[in-house]
Each structure stands twice: as structure tokens, then as C-alpha cells.
Amino acid sequence: MARVQFKQRESTDAIFVHCSATKPSQNVGVREIRQWHKEQGWLDVGYHFIIKRDGTVEAGRDEMAVGSHAKGYNHNSIGVCLVGGIDDKGKFDANFTPAQMQSLRSLLVTLLAKYEGAVLRAHHEVAPKACPSFDLKRWWEKNELVTSDRG
């Protein structure tokens, strides 16, 4: 299957962390999320990276392509999605695995070094959503994973 050619970002000013809003039992990856996004009418997966439950980091949309993950910010940001984020009843929950969080930290360190001056942001900072279901700043600074619907 030929990949869609997207406009390239001119700058990378932010790295957004998202969750897939899936239950812990749903071990999905880029293939499934791509399909969900296409079912919504998108041309491809909106995120640049997806981190599966086992900590595997999968490439989504080309890293330099404009993403589709944070309205109004896609032109100058990268989107990273953690699989999970809700419990079996559909409530927001920081149910991410230690392997996921280790992979997230490693990926973010790499991206922040690569894109000097980029800032780390949670999706809920720019949209009325609970995504990514945890307090990103607290986790980044103190390594404490705490469920949060607003950060």
C-alpha cells in the first residue's frame, strides 16, 4: 500500500503526549489506530509514535510530516500516543505499564534533544479532553504516575 504524502513541518516547537483511551485489555498498536483514524475520515494515523502496552515504540505518521493529533498545533508539533488510559468502566485511568513509561521517557529525551527548544505538553493543555489521563508535568519532573483528567 502506498503511503500518503503529507506536508512537512517547518519547525517542531512542541511534543504532545496522548493516550488512545483504550482499556488495559486492548493491546492495540499503530495498525489498529490507523484503521480507527481512517474510519473517522482521516488519511492516515494522526500520531507520529505509538507506545504499546509492552513498551514497544511503533512509528506512525512520518516524523517530519504534519500530524493530526492536536488541533491548531499539528503544523509545529509531534504526537506521541500511549496505548491505554481508561479502565474497564471507561473512566480515565493512568493504567500504563512500567515498560510504556520507560519507553515514553526514553523517546521524549531523544525527541527533546533532537528538537532543541521544543516543549513537552499534554493534549488536555490545548483541548477540552482528559488525554493523556495523567499529570504529565508531575510524571516528568518527579516520576510519579498519577491519574488526572486535566493534568
From Swiss-Prot:
<comment type="similarity">
    <text>Belongs to the N-acetylmuramoyl-L-alanine amidase 2 family.</text>
</comment>
<keyword id="KW-0204">Cytolysis</keyword>
<dbReference type="GO" id="GO:0008270">
    <property type="term" value="F:zinc ion binding"/>
</dbReference>
<keyword id="KW-1035">Host cytoplasm</keyword>
<keyword id="KW-0081">Bacteriolytic enzyme</keyword>
<keyword id="KW-0479">Metal-binding</keyword>
<dbReference type="InterPro" id="IPR015510">
    <property type="entry name" value="PGRP"/>
</dbReference>
<dbReference type="GO" id="GO:0042742">
    <property type="term" value="P:defense response to bacterium"/>
</dbReference>
<comment type="function">
    <text>Plays an important role in the switch between viral transcription and genome replication. Once produced in sufficient amount, interacts with and inhibits the viral RNA polymerase that becomes unable to produce additional late transcripts. This lysozyme-polymerase complex in turn plays an active role in viral genome replication and packaging.</text>
</comment>
<dbReference type="InterPro" id="IPR036505">
    <property type="entry name" value="Amidase/PGRP_sf"/>
</dbReference>
<feature type="site" description="Essential for amidase activity and zinc hydrate coordination">
    <location>
        <position position="47"/>
    </location>
</feature>
<dbReference type="Pfam" id="PF01510">
    <property type="entry name" value="Amidase_2"/>
</dbReference>
<dbReference type="GO" id="GO:0008745">
    <property type="term" value="F:N-acetylmuramoyl-L-alanine amidase activity"/>
</dbReference>
<feature type="site" description="Important for catalytic activity">
    <location>
        <position position="129"/>
    </location>
</feature>
<keyword id="KW-0578">Host cell lysis by virus</keyword>
<keyword id="KW-0929">Antimicrobial</keyword>
<dbReference type="GO" id="GO:0032897">
    <property type="term" value="P:negative regulation of viral transcription"/>
</dbReference>
<dbReference type="InterPro" id="IPR034689">
    <property type="entry name" value="Endolysin_T7_type"/>
</dbReference>
<keyword id="KW-0862">Zinc</keyword>
<dbReference type="GO" id="GO:0030430">
    <property type="term" value="C:host cell cytoplasm"/>
</dbReference>
<dbReference type="InterPro" id="IPR006619">
    <property type="entry name" value="PGRP_domain_met/bac"/>
</dbReference>
<keyword id="KW-1188">Viral release from host cell</keyword>
<feature type="domain" description="N-acetylmuramoyl-L-alanine amidase">
    <location>
        <begin position="10"/>
        <end position="132"/>
    </location>
</feature>
<feature type="binding site">
    <location>
        <position position="123"/>
    </location>
    <ligand>
        <name>Zn(2+)</name>
    </ligand>
</feature>
<feature type="binding site">
    <location>
        <position position="18"/>
    </location>
    <ligand>
        <name>Zn(2+)</name>
    </ligand>
</feature>
<keyword id="KW-0378">Hydrolase</keyword>
<dbReference type="GO" id="GO:0009253">
    <property type="term" value="P:peptidoglycan catabolic process"/>
</dbReference>
<dbReference type="InterPro" id="IPR002502">
    <property type="entry name" value="Amidase_domain"/>
</dbReference>
<protein>
    <recommendedName>
        <fullName>Endolysin</fullName>
        <ecNumber>3.5.1.28</ecNumber>
    </recommendedName>
</protein>
<comment type="subunit">
    <text>Interacts with the viral RNA polymerase.</text>
</comment>
<dbReference type="GO" id="GO:0044659">
    <property type="term" value="P:viral release from host cell by cytolysis"/>
</dbReference>
<comment type="function">
    <text>Endolysin with amidase activity that degrades host peptidoglycans and participates with the holin and spanin proteins in the sequential events which lead to the programmed host cell lysis releasing the mature viral particles. Once the holin has permeabilized the host cell membrane, the endolysin can reach the periplasm and breaking down the peptidoglycan layer.</text>
</comment>
<keyword id="KW-0426">Late protein</keyword>
<feature type="binding site">
    <location>
        <position position="131"/>
    </location>
    <ligand>
        <name>Zn(2+)</name>
    </ligand>
</feature>
